[in-house]
Amino acid sequence: MNSRSLLRPLLACSLAIMAATGTLAAATLEGIVFSAEPGQVFVPVDEAAEALKWNVGRDDEGKVFQLNDMELRAGSLRTLTDGTELVSTDMLARAGAPVSTADEKERIRVGRLFRGFTLRISPQQVEIDLAKQRLEGWQGGRLVLQTRISSGRNGRTPAGDFRAGPFRAVMHRSSRYNNAPMPWSVQIHGHIFVHGFTSVPNYPASHGCIRLPLDEGNPAKFFFEWVLSDTPVKVK
C-alpha cells in the first residue's frame, strides 16, 4: 500500500471530524434582491470578501475600486441607504469566485470548500410603525432599510396587512390632490402609496400616503428599487 492510499482514509476522517465540529461549516449570509434588477442577488462587499478571504481596495473616500484582482470604478456599486456597498453574485463570479445556481431552497454556494459562503434568498417584508413614524424593510433576518416617514394626518393612513403593488411608477401624480408629484411611488392599498416627498417631518402630515425622504441616502428610491411586488407590508 502506497503513502497516498494511507492518506486517503486519514483525510476522510479529518474532514468528517471538521464537519462534525463545524470547522467546515461555511458562513450563511442573507442575500438581498431588488425589483429593479431581477435575477441578481446581492451581499455586502465586506461580508463576501471576508468569507472568500479576498483583498478589497478602497479609495480615499472609502469606495471600493478593487475586488480580489478585479478593478472597479469607485462608487459604481449599488449601496444601502447607509452607504454599505453591495456586490452581486455575477460580479463575484467575474472576480473569480465559483457561483452555483440556486437550489430548491433558494440557496447559492459562492466560493470553494475553505473559502466561501452560502447565500440564502429569503422573502422580503415591510413594517410601518405609525406611532414611531418609522419604516423597516427586511430580507429574511437582514434589515436592509430603516427610515423615518410621515404618514397621514388625523389617522388617514389605515393600519392593516397589505401587499406592495400592483401599481408602481418612478413618477406618479396624485389624481386627488392637485396633480401633486409622488416620485418613486409604490401602491400598498387603494389610493395609499409609499412614495418620496420633499417634506418629511417627524409627524403625520400627508393626506394618507407614506412619505419617505428623497435625501439621507434617498430611501424613497431605494424602497422603490428594492421591494418586490406582492411583498407583505404591515402597517400598525
Range-by-range predicted roles:
Residues 34-45, 81-85, 128-131, 157, ...:
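Solvent-exposed, acidic/flexible segments
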Residues 64, 88-163, 170, 229-236:
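Intrinsically disordered, low-complexity
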Residues 22-123:
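Primary recognition of N-terminal secretory signal peptides and signal-anchoring hydrophobic helices
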Residues 157-161, 171-236:
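Exported/periplasmic cell-wall-interacting domains
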Residues 39, 68-71, 141, 190, ...:
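Residue-level detection of beta-strand-connecting loop/turn positions
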Residues 10-22:
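Bacterial N-terminal signal peptides
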Residues 2-11:
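Bacterial N-terminal signal peptides that target proteins for export
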Residues 42-49, 89, 93, 132, ...:
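Extracytoplasmic/secreted envelope proteins and their assembly/folding machinery
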